[in-house]
């Protein structure tokens, strides 16, 4: 493991891990042990946990890595899914996270062209693994980009993660952070290359996320 991860952990600096499946399981496992936040592609949760249901796989990841405050799976044109943990010792009965996800999908406004977010309440959640967590599930939708404007998706994942980091540093609420990150990724798609289309902070398309309080 590289020294700067250990130094950040020693200095209690939060660590966001981009869980790339190309890393070896041992190397990535050590990083996830230190993670404060985890972001991954939609294929990673099943590959890591052997659980095909994404919400249940995200729950299993948070059970495996108790220091992580949330895990986000990016889902391309389907947006993203986030499982956020809070510390709570209440003994309430657990609710199946798959059922929670289905309920949230019904609340998504499919006619919205711009990114949106729907969230469950905080509750004790169970999945197809053995553990439970107290937290909430959020679904963020992607921007609906007209076909003539869709140029190149290279670097969209990195753009999304960069926006999540900005959201964390500015203490954005998750309900705003997810649409913001999806919007940044959507803007990037309109130019060739990983960096050319990245928006400036002054971009008018981001103003609704940046002018409001968290």
Predicted regions and their residues:
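Short beta->alpha connector loops
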Residues: 1-2, 19-24
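Short, well-ordered alpha-helix to beta-strand connector turns
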Residues: 12-13, 35-36, 68
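Short, glycine/polar-rich helix-capping loops at beta-to-alpha or helix-loop-helix junctions
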Residues: 23-31
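Conserved phosphate-binding/catalytic region of the ribokinase-like
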Residues: 24-25, 52-214
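Structural alpha-helical scaffold elements that stabilize or flank donor/cofactor-binding regions
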Residues: 30-31, 38, 64
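A generic structural signal for short hydrophobic patches within well-formed alpha-helices
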Residues: 45-46, 80
């Amino acid at each position: 493991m590289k020294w700067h991860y250990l130094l950040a952990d020693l200095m209690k600096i939060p660590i966001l891990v981009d869980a790339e499946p190309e890393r070896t399981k041992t190397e990535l496992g050590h990083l996830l042990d230190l993670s404060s936040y985890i972001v991954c592609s939609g294929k990673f949760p099943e590959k890591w946990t052997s659980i095909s249901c994404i919400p249940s796989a995200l729950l299993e990841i948070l059970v495996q890595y108790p220091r992580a405050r949330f895990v986000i799976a990016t889902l391309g044109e389907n947006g993203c899914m986030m499982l956020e943990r809070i510390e709570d010792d209440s003994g309430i009965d657990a609710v199946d996270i798959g059922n929670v996800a289905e309920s949230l999908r019904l609340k998504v406004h499919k006619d919205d062209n711009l990114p949106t977010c729907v969230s469950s309440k905080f509750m004790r959640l169970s999945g197809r693994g053995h553990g439970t967590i107290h937290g909430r599930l959020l679904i963020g939708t992607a921007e609906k980009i007209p076909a003539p404007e869709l140029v190149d998706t290279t670097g969209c994942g990195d753009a999304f993660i960069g926006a999540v980091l900005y959201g964390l540093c500015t203490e954005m609420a998750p309900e705003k952070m997810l649409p913001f990150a999806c919007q940044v990724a959507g803007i990037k798609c309109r130019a060739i290359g990983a960096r050319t289309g990245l928006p400036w902070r002054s971009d008018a398309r981001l103003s609704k996320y940046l002018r409001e309080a968290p």
